[in-house]
């Protein structure tokens, strides 16, 4: 069974806290924008539609300003790490910032510890009804959501990840299980990159 990791509490960092608050606020603004877009799709009254269009435009501008602030703080926090993570296909500036804000332990733990910390380390469920089933539990749901979105981009663009995903699906694994396995591999790769401050390299063969 994978052991749940109780990582040492990171030393408080004012810049990291700023980054976390900016990322959280951006997430809120994106959610508001998406909600307004859905309302626009349903609205039929011209005045209501005009109001929604104006609101969506305002939210878009706020998100852009938040993106600029996130980029500035992220580079101040750790420019080398930001650059390394930014070389991963499918991982843009906001994803990089989310990893830096919500996972300060990245690069400081070994592969098993980082997987367990995030909640991507599988463990066996042995019982009279379910013998040998593999599950994941606990961990940081926010980081798993970030990795989930990023991993689909990596699977689409990187041959080794695409092959891994397809092999798992061919063996009868559900899509969720297959992408979770790829997320675990991606996290381990990111952890090594953060530790060594090295760029992404596609694994051939």
Where do the PLM segments sit?
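Basic, amphipathic alpha-helical segments enriched in Lys/Arg and hydrophobic/aromatic residues
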Residues: 170-205
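Active-site catalytic microenvironments for nucleophilic, acid-base chemistry
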Residues: 4, 102, 106, 189
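Long, charge-rich intrinsically disordered scaffolds of nucleic-acid metabolism proteins
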Residues: 1-87
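Cytochrome P450 C-terminal beta-domain/meander region
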Residues: 82-89, 135-139
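Phosphate-backbone recognition surface of nucleic-acid-processing proteins
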Residues: 93, 98-171, 175, 202-204
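Generic hydrophobic alpha-helical segments
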Residues: 85, 164-165, 190
